[in-house]
């Protein structure tokens, strides 16, 4: 639907990167325990009219201080792809779906990963309510959101300039 709110910049605040790409970005930051040092990105639009206000498809590469390289992508062009895979010299793991509302499933080079079933958002809301009721800091600090936004801005800058962006 070309008139849906996700395609209106003033309502959505962004496009595919800010709505769904952030999950891949967060996964890479969480898995490495590091912030990206260099980000390179590019954007593709298959329908310039439909996606005139927001990004449709973005691919980006993040280089981390440890040498880890993460290749990520996000799109509004099609749905159903919600996987994450990490590989290294002694094995791999993958989640598919990695970002679903109805649970996560995964495998490793050594077998299946087991997760508690449940709604992720219920846990988030329970934690938020507990923090308010008990005057405690959330386990997901606001600084994490700021770090995500710094990386997102670097992705957009790389798209605009066509060059890699170094982060401090």
Regions found by a protein language model. Give the residues of each.
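Alpha-helical packing segments of well-folded alpha/beta enzyme cores
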Residues: 24, 124, 148-152
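C-terminal helix-rich "cap/oligomerization" subdomain common to oxidoreductases
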Residues: 65, 113, 130-168
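Glycine/small-residue-rich pyrophosphate-binding loop that anchors the diphosphate of NDP-sugar donors
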Residues: 16, 20, 58-60, 136
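Alpha-helical elements of Rossmann-like donor-binding domains used by nucleotide-donor carbohydrate transfer enzymes
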Residues: 26-27, 59, 127, 144, ...
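NAD(P)-dinucleotide binding in Rossmann-like oxidoreductases
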Residues: 43-57, 62-126, 141
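Predominantly a Rossmann-like dinucleotide-binding segment in NAD(P)-dependent oxidoreductases
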Residues: 1-50, 162
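Phosphate/oxyanion-binding loops and surfaces in catalytic or ligand/nucleic-acid-binding neighborhoods
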Residues: 31-35, 89-93, 152-158
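Conserved loop-to-helix N-cap of the C-terminal "lid" that shapes the substrate pocket in Rossmann-like
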Residues: 17, 21, 118, 139-146
């Amino acid at each position: 639907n070309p008139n849906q709110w996700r395609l209106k910049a003033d309502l959505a605040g962004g496009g595919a990167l800010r709505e769904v790409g952030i999950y891949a970005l967060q996964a890479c930051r969480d898995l490495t325990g590091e912030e990206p040092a260099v980000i390179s990105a590019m954007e593709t639009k298959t329908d310039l009219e439909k996606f005139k206000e927001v990004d449709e498809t973005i691919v980006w590469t993040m280089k981390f201080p440890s040498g880890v390289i993460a290749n990520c992508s996000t799109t509004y062009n099609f749905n159903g792809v919600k996987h994450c895979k990490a590989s290294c010299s002694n094995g791999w793991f993958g989640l598919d779906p990695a970002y679903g509302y109805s649970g996560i499933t995964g495998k490793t080079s050594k077998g299946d990963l087991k997760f508690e079933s449940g709604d992720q958002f219920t846990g988030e809301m329970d934690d938020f309510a507990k923090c308010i009721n008990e005057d405690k800091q959330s386990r997901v600090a606001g600084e994490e959101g700021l770090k995500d936004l710094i990386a997102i801005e670097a992705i957009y800058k790389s798209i605009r300039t066509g060059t890699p962006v170094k982060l401090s």
